[in-house]
Swiss-Prot record:
Species whose genome carries this gene: Clostridioides difficile (strain 630)
PANTHER family linked to this entry: ARGININE--TRNA LIGASE, CYTOPLASMIC (PTHR11956:SF5), ARGINYL-TRNA SYNTHETASE (PTHR11956)
GO cellular component: cytoplasm
Alphabetic keyword roster: Aminoacyl-tRNA synthetase, ATP-binding, Cytoplasm, Ligase, Nucleotide-binding, Protein biosynthesis
Localization terms from the record: Cytoplasm
Motif ('HIGH' region): 123-133
Record's subunit section: Monomer.
Name of the protein described by the UniProt record: Arginine--tRNA ligase
Length: 566
């Protein structure tokens, strides 16, 4: 979008023959403090070439560059050459681009003709969709939208945990203590009670574990009763999951879970045998990874049943053959790091060069304020309850501020759910954190509602404008520092999206949104917009519209709504 970096790299290229224009442009940074200028070029890489200290090189370069056109001032700060740009041109470039591209502002064709799979959410059938699932669900959805916005063909997969020995346990528990009508009245909580009861009873009667394994083997071998019960557990669970996905406005392209690969695992075992990778170990079959300082990868148990590893290998091969992906991203908690390292290594040892395109996007664990979560003991906060409580709390706040507010239910849902989503995405994903109702639902400080309120504020100003807002304005009226700060942030939108994409870190976008909201609110506080002077009013309204559009685009990028009134 921006000609400033190009203009700066053109100036520098005349002085630096040893770097290409593209290399120079790639090195240009934005200084941490606006008093240091709009852009900075680091000279450390040139020290060996010029055989001088970086600050001396920076000083000589700064003195040799004459300000002109886009660049109004050039100074040396330490080992950097710092550039101040023409604020009127900055305003014109940014505002024209935003108002021209509208909802596509920030988008690019960076990933054109490339395919990315994002696997996320992936709850276990017949187990609670709890607050611990919020992270994979919203991080994955944000990554899907980020990649999609940059031109990738992006496929959303919900790899349901609909297979495994837990179904043997559930079948045993249901046959002993379950009632169909009771389960159908409240599926997940009732199935959870059965699952927890199985574990309590099995502590006293270990033979129940053998019974559960036998039922799972029956399921693997196509036993009719086992298959019917499994399908029923799956259908009832999906009804509950879909209510949560509807609250979050999340959809998937595929719900092919573990069971989908049950008939594709023999091929994996045959391929492993062909490559001489399988070894016997205490009756089980493994891939030995000692050479790579990892424990063995378990492929089949001693009773012949398969494991997560087998199904994950089958899924990866199927996806490569079906979608021919350039990247396959797995949004799964960091406690699974070893599993992913083993599995990616096995794919590599099988001779697949696309092993390098498998990416584990890990994230920290969620704990409750009163302790960690455990399905086996039944101590869990249901995600649907968390979202509904957020909506109810938001409704109370809105009605307390404005008892006559319209569309309260719709706005409460958009803001309440948005508060939870933003909270989940506002820190580096790798950090562990403790779930707190008070912090999540706080409407002060660096929160989702603060960003949404800033968007609604822009909309309110534009409704009162009484003039058509266009890009046909006097841009010199936006050359002040408050306006320039807003424009600098808006200009960095695509750069931040691409950085979030390259690091698979949605919190880079939440930080961008907060920076923009804070810069705009300072501008709004210090610069009256609906003034009598028509030229000033039109210029400032154009800035408001550009801010509103950019906030709306960034909120949507994270799976949040942009309410026009709050």
């Amino acid at each position: 979008m921006q000609d400033f970096k190009v203009a700066i790299s053109n100036c520098l290229k005349e002085k630096i023959e040893d770097l290409s224009k593209e290399e120079i442009e790639a090195l240009i940074e934005v200084p941490p403090n606006k008093d240091m200028g709009d852009y900075a070029f680091p000279c450390f890489k040139l020290a060996k070439v010029f055989r001088k200290a970086p600050n001396m090189i920076a000083s000589e370069l700064a003195e040799s560059i004459e300000p002109s056109g886009e660049i109004t001032k050039v100074i040396q700060l330490g080992g950097y050459v710092n550039f101040f740009v023409n604020k009127s041109q900055l305003a014109e470039t940014v505002i024209k681009k935003v108002l021209d591209e509208k909802e596509n502002y920030g988008h690019s064709d960076f990933g054109k003709d490339k395919t990315v799979i994002v696997e996320y959410s992936s709850p276990n059938i017949a187990k609670p969709f709890h607050i611990g699932h919020i992270r994979t669900t919203v991080i994955g959805n944000a990554l899907y939208k980020i990649y999609d916005s940059q031109g990738y063909k992006t496929i959303r997969i919900n790899h349901l945990g609909d297979y495994g020995t837990q179904f043997g346990k559930l079948i045993v528990a249901f046959k002993k203590w379950g009632e169909k009508e009771v389960v159908e009245s409240n599926p997940i909580p009732e199935l959870l009670k059965l699952y927890v009861r199985f574990h309590d009873e099995a502590e006293q009667h270990p033979e129940m574990e053998d019974e559960a394994r036998a039922w799972f083997n029956k399921l693997e071998n196509g036993d009719e009763e086992a298959q019917e019960l499994w399908q029923w557990f799956r259908n009832e669970s999906l009804k509950e999951f879909n209510r949560v996905y509807k609250l979050l406005d999340i959809e998937f392209d595929s719900l092919a879970g573990e069971s989908f690969y049950s008939d594709k695992m023999n091929r994996v075992i045959e391929l492993l045998e062909e490559k001489n990778l399988l070894k016997e170990s205490k009756g089980a079959r493994i891939v030995d990874l000692e050479e790579y300082k990892m424990p063995p990868a378990l492929i089949t148990k001693n009773d012949g049943s398969t494991l997560y590893m087998t199904r994950d290998l089958a899924a990866a091969i199927y996806r490569k053959e079906t979608y021919d992906f350039d990247k396959c991203i797995y949004v799964v908690g960091s406690q699974q790091n070893l599993h992913f390292q083993q599995w990616f290594k096995v794919i590599e040892l099988m001779g697949y060069d696309w092993a390098k395109d498998l990416i584990h996007v890990g994230f920290g664990m969620v704990a409750l304020e009163e302790g960690t979560m455990s399905t086996r003991k039944g101590r869990v906060v249901f995600l649907e309850d968390a979202l509904n409580q957020a909506i109810d709390k938001t409704k109370e706040i809105i009605l307390a501020k404005n008892p006559n507010a319209k569309n309260v239910d719709e706005i409460s849902k958009q803001v309440g759910v948005g508060a939870v989503v933003f909270q989940e995405l506002s820190n580096s994903r790798i950090k562990d954190y403790t779930f707190s109702w008070e912090r999540t639902l706080s409407f002060d400080g660096e929160t989702g509602p603060y960003v949404q309120y800033t968007h609604a504020r822009c909309c309110a100003v534009l409704r009162k404008a009484e003039v058509e807002v266009t890009s046909d304005i006097d841009y010199s009226l936006l050359a002040d520092e408050d306006s320039a700060e807003v424009l600098r942030v808006i200009e960095s939108f695509n750069k931040n999206i691409l950085l979030a994409l390259k690091k698979n870190e949605p919190h880079i976008v939440t930080r961008f949104m907060l920076d923009l909201a804070q810069a705009f609110n300072k501008f709004y506080h210090d610069n009256p917009i609906l003034v009598e002077n028509l030229e000033i009013r039109k210029a400032r309204l154009a800035l408001v519209l550009a801010t509103k559009q950019t906030l709306e685009n960034s909120l949507k990028l994270l799976g949040m709504h942009a309410p026009e009134r709050m």
